[in-house]
């Protein structure tokens, strides 16, 4: 087991207490061991190398496996601890650039320049030629750009995201290879890097270890997390050995830079040049500008889908359902559902919600390319919906005066009630609860005479239908007049309160 000083990440410092575990009767799960399993450090993971392995990321964020140089007998965990200890020693003497203020002398050190070129530089070239009129947009090139946008986009949503990151379905090698190759056309990094950072996002949503932590602001979660160098102090890991076991993932990662250049720029340029005699149009519109649009659409999942929309399933974290984002990302905008049910191959569950990715996954399953499509049960989905609705109702209830709580009221026996009634002529018993109606007699809808006949008496039967079956609103008005509970009738009082939604723990009442 790790020694003191180990930097295995725990998800939350606040853990619920379990009496059975703390008493020693039942063993607790070893959190350190469980986190080692969650990061995959108990498994052998050969390193996959390429020329730009950290494309769209940074070394601090993607150091998933470790170099084989040195002691070959060291486990992944041993290498991790050794590297973490080295970083700790360096941190004692050197403050990371992300923790330093921006100045005219160091501003360039804050930036991830590779990503600046990929995310900002190349789009600027494309927009310059497009907006200046140097390369006009023709209809055929536009239509092809839209088609190719869909090819690259679906390769990300159905491939990178739902197939590899979440294993929401399985696919045979032709489909996996297609997604691996044309996922490169979106210039969003290799599937290995993309899937690793995405699994970290789900494991540490809305924490400092979340690569695109929405709490750090809209701009940071949209693009800042890629354009700025991340603090290695908050580096996190997730198990992706299932991904590295896939030969299509290994092939793509090894050759990512070549595949990216071919699919993102060379292929659209050649197709538009050969079929439409417009090489420059293919490069600018089907290449640079298409990449810019698909990148920005994907970034909206990390940003807008955590800021705009509804939270019908849970509101403890920031993800939201947003139909606007769903339109440009082939159905990925229903983010609240996705974070609650991540292994469901669907992101949208209602017929009118836009999710072409789930349709494509379903269609590929019909022709035998995809299989084992996973869905959460409708019962589990309904449970989440009802729990969230109840949470909203409880918040509204907390803002309303529901009358005195029964446990805060004094306990009277019937003799005490009779004695008090001689002093206060407005007391009446209904369902085991004493109410002071003296200030309500003149407002009683049934008239003063009827209510006066109940003073100093038990009017439960008359109130509950013997004379008039009072409405729910009448019961709520009556609850504001509570002054005591009759000891002999406390069970009736509890039943009345429970009908109004009041909850009292069994065995702790009075």
UniProtKB/Swiss-Prot annotation:
Fe cation 2 binds at residues 201, 306, 335, 339. Pfam families: Cyt-b5, FA_desaturase. Fe cation 1 binds at residues 161, 166, 198, 202, 338. SMART domains: Cyt-b5 (SM01117). GO terms for molecular function: electron transfer activity; heme binding; iron ion binding; stearoyl-CoA 9-desaturase activity. The keyword Lipid biosynthesis applies. It is found in: Endoplasmic reticulum membrane. Disulfide bonds: none annotated. Its main location: endoplasmic reticulum. It is a multi-pass membrane protein. GO terms for cellular component: endoplasmic reticulum; endoplasmic reticulum membrane. A motif (Histidine box-3) lies at residues 335-339. Heme binds at residues 444, 470. It catalyses: octadecanoyl-CoA + 2 Fe(II)-[cytochrome b5] + O2 + 2 H(+) = (9Z)-octadecenoyl-CoA + 2 Fe(III)-[cytochrome b5] + 2 H2O; hexadecanoyl-CoA + 2 Fe(II)-[cytochrome b5] + O2 + 2 H(+) = (9Z)-hexadecenoyl-CoA + 2 Fe(III)-[cytochrome b5] + 2 H2O. Residues 1-112, 160-255, 302-510 are cytoplasmic. A motif (Histidine box-2) lies at residues 198-202. Belongs to the fatty acid desaturase type 1 family. Stearoyl-CoA desaturase that utilizes O(2) and electrons from reduced cytochrome b5 to introduce the first double bond into saturated fatty acyl-CoA substrates. Catalyzes the insertion of a cis double bond at the delta-9 position into fatty acyl-CoA substrates including palmitoyl-CoA and stearoyl-CoA. Required for the biosynthesis of membrane phospholipids, cholesterol esters and triglycerides. Regulates fatty acid desaturation, that is, the ratio of unsaturated versus saturated fatty acyl chains, by competing with the acyltransferase STC1 for the common substrate C16:0-CoA. This is Acyl-CoA desaturase 1. It comes from Saccharomyces cerevisiae (strain ATCC 204508 / S288c). The lineage of its organism: Eukaryota, Fungi, Dikarya, Ascomycota, Saccharomycotina.
